[in-house]
Amino acid sequence: MTTSGQPTDRQHLHDELERVRADLRDLVAHAGPADLRRRTDGTRWTNGQLLWHMAFGFLIVRRLLPLVRLFGRLPDRFGRRFAAVLEAATRPFHTVNYLGSVGGALVFHGPRLPAQLDRTIAQLHRRLDAEPEATLGRRMHFPVGWDPFFHDTMTLAEVYAYGIAHYDFHRTQLTLEQS
């Protein structure tokens, strides 16, 4: 259930995941070497590094799902403490987040990048289809200092949508010729 008590619109999430998959594939296919080396608007990354970071957001979603399932079953205080511990590590997290995208772009570029996203989104589709509706309403606390799209608490359904919002936000920062 969504926070409004309505069933989760799974088809909308599926459609949005497919939109992202097609968009990244198109961006990578049309970006030349000079495009990928160009700085982005509002980040310290190049376009190539930001493209990896955008795809990596969906890998993060895959790792967050079991955490939300687990903490969604535990008393609220456990999730609140876990989020507080993560929040205390916000500064090192931002450094690792930045450097991880610098390094990730060295490995995942060209056709490897959309192939990785294809595999990840296919896994997210399968998981979303398998989630019982009650599980989609489970929630946990998040370290809000880590990402502007993290909220104090998020449901499993909101975590699926997080990757899409993260992607769309960063897409506006690309400085590719056709973006």
Task: Describe each PLM feature range.
Residues 20-36, 171:
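Short, Lys/Arg-rich amphipathic segments at extreme N-termini
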Residues 16, 105-117:
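A short, structured beta-strand-centered segment in the mid-to-C-terminal lobe
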Residues 1-18:
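Extreme N-terminal tail/first-helix region
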Residues 2-3, 126, 130:
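Charge-dense, helix-prone N-terminal extensions
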Residues 90-96:
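Histidine-centered catalytic/metal-coordination loop motif
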